[in-house]
């Protein structure tokens, strides 16, 4: 990946990386030999280096800061997101955490390898609750590292996008969506 070719969206990003055990094995759609955790780490580094405000958090049944920064190399970031085992995976945590902690977010990015709803509220409902409570027209980008036919984003909501797989165009696509260009 080349960090210089990604134009920033200029929005406040909250990246939520699935850190469940399944992310360390297998391959992602589009890049044979690349694990889901390594791909999410690479995307997180790109966002941290290009966006003016980016928080990178890990999730499964809990939500926590991964300590990943713009200064991290991809291999360092991969170490920070690999081997963390929590319980079941709850993709609503980014929105509920931001709401509870009064964090202003324009773009939530959830990176996972499979359908993830193990909580009390579905991610789509959590986003709507966040939007209503904050007045922010927050967007949701779900990056599915493996193609399992799932969707977390609501296909009828223009503020939500599902992306499956990974290639060099993924960061630019995400930035354009966050800016409202697509």
Q: Where do the model's predicted regions map?
A:
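Acidic, glycine-rich A-domain
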Residues: 1-182
